[in-house]
Amino acid sequence: MSSRKKKDAEVAQASVEVNPDLDVEELEGVGRVTGAKLKERGFFTVRDVAFASVKELAEVVGNEERALQIVEAARKMLGLHSFVSALEVYERRKTIRRISTGVKALDELLGGGIETRAVTEVAGEFGSGKTQLCHQLAVMVQLPEERGGLGAKAIYIDTENTFRPERIMQIAKARGLDPDQALNNIFYARAYSSDHQMILVDQAKSIIKQNNVALLVVDSVIAHFRSEFPGRENLAERQQKLNKHVADLLRLADAYDVAVVITNQVMAQPDVFFGNPLRPAGGNILAHGATYRLWLRKSKENIRIAKIFDSPYHPEGEVSFRITEEGLVD
């Protein structure tokens, strides 16, 4: 390749790297027909393909060899095809955004708030404050950055019919936001099954592309999976399906710079005689899938305790907060 052509290629490469939403048909090896098939399955852009698995694309294009070529081309265009230095990773982490929880002590525990490009799991018993925290985050993300938000919208997937717009309005009013506008900035969907839940996550990608969305809530992530796959005989199938769902959430968070918050139920350990007999549901799939894991528990009256019990770099610790009419406060 001549120096001129090489330079032109580098310029073209750079232009694509800052435009991950380039139409999928611009990819090498993807024409109009293949592009139409990919779009039918939700792969609209170079970014969508770059974060997909070869197996997913093979189901669309017909074979794994061609799927691998397309995925590698997309990743190369976005600069995701090779190793980078740890310093580059560090510099990239500096661009991660955080959403304040509205509770100063909890923000400090989390290193500044809920991170984008990560999945934060919130586990705890019924009434421990999981859904309350989700409601508050859906409001907090709308605040300007100087007040702890990102000036953005939220997507809320409700699996247990616990979303209450009235609660959003209370919290929004307490934070100085117009209650009606706060509701208008939340894209809500009720999931009626695990399949429906996973479809909604796929649909969320289109909403994120077309709107300034920085938060995706799934409350709760495990409910439908537990009810649809009861008993040990169905456990393997359940975990396999749950694994795909969590992987989709992780990819979405990273690809679109979104904070993903999932709530989780608890289960009893009958063989535990000392300490807390409860543990988060979902087994190793959620344990390894979530980036950060919070445990909420009740204390006296309206006080709740939040403990971070799994994190790549946060030390374990716990703080208390109160649930009031205005929302969660120190």
Curated annotation (Swiss-Prot):
SUPFAM superfamilies in UniProt: P-loop containing nucleoside triphosphate hydrolases, Rad51 N-terminal domain-like
Entry-linked InterPro entries: AAA+_ATPase, DNA_recomb/repair_Rad51_C, DNA_recomb/repair_RadA, DNA_recomb/repair_RecA-like, DNA_repair_Rad51/TF_NusA_a-hlx, P-loop_NTPase, RecA_ATP-bd, RecA_monomer-monomer_interface
GO biological process: DNA recombination; DNA repair
Annotated ATP binding sites: G124, E125, F126, G127, S128, G129, K130, T131
One Gene Ontology MF term: ATP-dependent DNA damage sensor activity
NCBIfam families recorded: PRK04301.1, recomb_radA
Protein's name in the database: DNA repair and recombination protein RadA
Gene from which this protein is expressed: radA
